[in-house]
Curated annotation (Swiss-Prot):
HAMAP family named in the record: Ribosomal_uS12_B
Keyword Flavoprotein on entry: no
Biological process annotations from GO: translation
Record-given protein name: Small ribosomal subunit protein uS12
InterPro entries noted in UniProt: NA-bd_OB-fold, Ribosomal_uS12, Ribosomal_uS12_bac
Signal peptide: none
Swiss-Prot/TrEMBL keywords: Methylation, Ribonucleoprotein, Ribosomal protein, RNA-binding, rRNA-binding, tRNA-binding
Modified residues (3-methylthioaspartic acid): D89
GO MF annotation list: rRNA binding; structural constituent of ribosome; tRNA binding
Length: 123
């Protein structure tokens, strides 16, 4: 515990919170080009093959984005839009790829929560 005189000499430093999505440059979304599309396994105790893509953004950052939903049409050189939002069981994945935007198709046969997966309203 510092004394009053010590606090007058050097006041307490305000702790800055670190940015959780540095590649977005304070933008809601960013556009980028897929450089690699692959699957990876989550950390314990989960087990799956999660679909992810390495994306080179317009500002030069290279980030890993998660591809949500069942099935996708992404391949190398696909132009995608990313948003912030990490995937808890995939270390290093801090962004989500938006479905139904640019080259990414929406999820087929999606009935509920369609807007999150870029699916049109079924007839």
């Amino acid at each position: 515990m510092p004394t009053i005189n010590q606090l007058i000499a050097n006041p307490r430093k305000i702790q800055k919170s670190r940015n959780k999505v540095p590649a977005l440059d304070a933008c809601p979304q960013k556009r980028g080009v897929c450089t690699r599309v692959y699957t990876t396994t989550p950390k314990k105790p989960n087990s799956a093959l999660r679909k992810v893509a390495k994306v080179r953004l317009t500002n030069g950052f290279e980030v890993i984005g998660y591809i949500p939903g069942e099935g996708h049409n992404l391949q190398e050189h696909s132009v995608v839009m990313i948003r912030g939002g990490r995937v808890k069981d995939l270390p290093g994945v801090r962004y989500h790829i938006l479905r139904g935007v640019l080259d990414t198709q929406g999820v087929k046969n999606r009935k509920q929560r369609r807007s999150k997966y870029g699916a049109k309203r079924p007839k």
